[in-house]
Amino acid sequence: MNDVFLKALPVLQKLTTAGFEAYFVGGSVRDYLLNRTISDVDIATSAFPEEVKEIFQTSYDTGIAHGTVTVRENNEFYEVTTFRTEGTYEDFRRPSEVTFIRSLEEDLKRRDFTMNAIAMDEHFALHDPFSGQLAIQNKEIKAVGKASERFHEDALRMMRAVRFLSQLDFELDKETEKALESQIELLQHTSVERMTVEWIKMMKGKAAKRAIELLLKVKMETYLPGLKDEKPALSEFASWDWEKRTTEESIWLGLVVAVKPNNVNAFLKAWKLPNKTIQLVNKAYQDALKMKETWLTDELYHAGKAVFSLVNELNVIRGQENNQHKLSQAYEALPIHSKKDLAITGADLLKWSGESAGPWVKETLDKVECGVLSNEINNEKIQIKRWLGYHEE
């Protein structure tokens, strides 16, 4: 049995010893059945939150309104959630009310897909009322109950379906795909932040190309930031070899290269990306657009390692030769990597000249920077001083 389950097993045992039901549920059980890496486990129980807190010495109310208590066991923290049913969904994400119950099957009934509605008890026996194992065997993403109801409860589940297709290389069953297509407009009620997370996970999957093809088939791009009417660009984007991707930034650089938005900054901001990512992708955009492979010395210098590495990564994704080693060698061979590496400062110029500060200081440092980069002069203080025409004291 997987070590992650074995380590968490005492949590289940404490709950069952106290007279309650307790199970591993959700993604960890699915991934166990698929022989995928399991990072953490979710635990569901018939014990109500206050009952859970009585059983464990250390606990935290991390989501008690929805039945979740975090408990500590063997110096590890585990989320334990009470079986529950949910009322109507008023904002296509959150239920209007949550009712704690004692029935495992009723709890599993509210979950999104059958492969995520399998429970495992303390003896590692599986409880699978919705045939999730069969769906996994058939490599099928199938909604629990009516797909239209599951998507109406939380519209993000539509993106999750496409993401799982990419990650697992599965297919959507006919009813689920039909509901996805007919209810796709519900996605407009989903926050950008949540969609961005799903987009990144989708692009990291092994079947990203098929996922994008499905996304376009159901017109999901209409509700994604900056992608309305961009079907041709996304088709091109999907054709690249994304299994060669090594960074998240390459996903965003590839997207702007394919879409060519008028304002790259605004396009990326619409996805609520970190400023650091936006700045890097923005800086790399023009070089990536040109599919630059050969870099002059000053181009390498002004781009910096992060930019030329990102451009090279996208070039590889688009089928070009990997020049990373050659570019890195050329970059490391540069005499300086930023103006801060110069052997002189503005203070030196003021001291040598005896003049007041002014624009001339920056202009002179720029001149020295160019001279050092072109190997016209060595980056040594005395040589630079002579080169500028100042006499030695």
Swiss-Prot record:
Q: Which reaction does it catalyse?
A: a tRNA precursor + 2 CTP + ATP = a tRNA with a 3' CCA end + 3 diphosphate; a tRNA with a 3' CCA end + 2 CTP + ATP = a tRNA with a 3' CCACCA end + 3 diphosphate
Output the InterPro entries linked to this UniProt entry. Answer: Bact_CCA-adding_enz_type3_sf, CCA-adding_enz_C, CCA-adding_enz_firmicutes, NT_sf, PolA_pol_head_dom, PolyA_RNA-bd
**SUPFAM superfamilies referenced in this protein's UniProt entry, alphabetically:** Nucleotidyltransferase, Poly A polymerase C-terminal region-like
List of residues binding ATP:
G27, R30, R111, D154, R157, R160, R163
Gene Ontology MF: a single term: ATP binding
Detail which positions bind Mg(2+).
Answer: D40, D42
Query: So which cofactors does this thing need?
Result: Mg(2+)
Mention any Pfam family matching this sequence.
tRNA_NucTran2_2
Q: Which PANTHER family match?
A: CCA TRNA NUCLEOTIDYLTRANSFERASE 1, MITOCHONDRIAL
User: What is stated as this protein's family in its record?
Assistant: Belongs to the tRNA nucleotidyltransferase/poly(A) polymerase family. Bacterial CCA-adding enzyme type 3 subfamily.
Q: How does it assemble?
A: Homodimer.
Annotated protein name in UniProt = CCA-adding enzyme
Q: Which organism is it from?
A: Listeria monocytogenes serotype 4a (strain HCC23)
**Recorded name of the encoding gene:** cca
